[in-house]
């Protein structure tokens, strides 16, 4: 199966990043969001990234012009998914919202299109099972910033077809990502491990174990992490981390209990 047209639903940080790399690959890419202000912000995010690349000599103006031709911005979901080979949902981590979108996608997307969710923690089965085509639905978890981070976590559920898995792996390869394949368990492989580290770092900060800067430095120099857990929590967004923690707490109890509001505020302390 070839990739010619991709639709990305949700123009936030993740959605705009996914749309950007698809356009750079040469695929006709449609970025869709129901809120015009969100769509405009997504457009600005992409423009800003490309302009930075030009200033640093990593991108040319000609490349930007070519990539821009591959991008279309839509408010209407039906228009966005028309003729798409792949639809990637990247809306906030709210299960009912994702279910609603996939119910719509089953109706309006091409019947041979692969339908992916970029969720970082929500069960793929819980999304797929609201449709009558679960075999076409898969998790494709990208990482922020999408154009830079090399990992793509592919999440298969029990009803996912081998064809769908192979297609997702092919897309990852074409986009220059290193793919891992994991089972549909709470938090998958990355969030299940990652939020524990971030959660504990926030607790350590609130207990006065060390400063934010020193906690981050401990992991960067002691374990070769490119970014400290508190820095990463701020980059991902404490609201996103909270949603992931709340989701995982239902399955793993105290290990993933969200820190208190006071602890969260402290995590925003300068890292340097």
Model regions: which residues?
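NAD(P)+-binding Rossmann beta1-loop-alpha1 motif at the extreme N-terminus of oxidoreductases
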Residues: 1-52, 56
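Short loop/edge segments at beta-strand edges and connector loops
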Residues: 75, 117, 183
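Rossmann-fold NAD(P)-binding glycine/threonine-rich loop
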Residues: 100-148, 158-164
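Rossmann-like NAD(P)-binding element
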Residues: 58-59, 63-114
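Acidic/polar active-site rim loop that often engages polyanionic ligands
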Residues: 145-154, 225-227, 246
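Internal alpha-helical scaffold of NAD(P)-dependent oxidoreductase catalytic cores
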Residues: 27, 133, 154-185, 197-226
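Conserved small/polar residues in nucleotide/adenosyl-binding loops
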Residues: 256-263
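Hydrophobic alpha-helical segments, chiefly the membrane-spanning helices
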Residues: 267-272
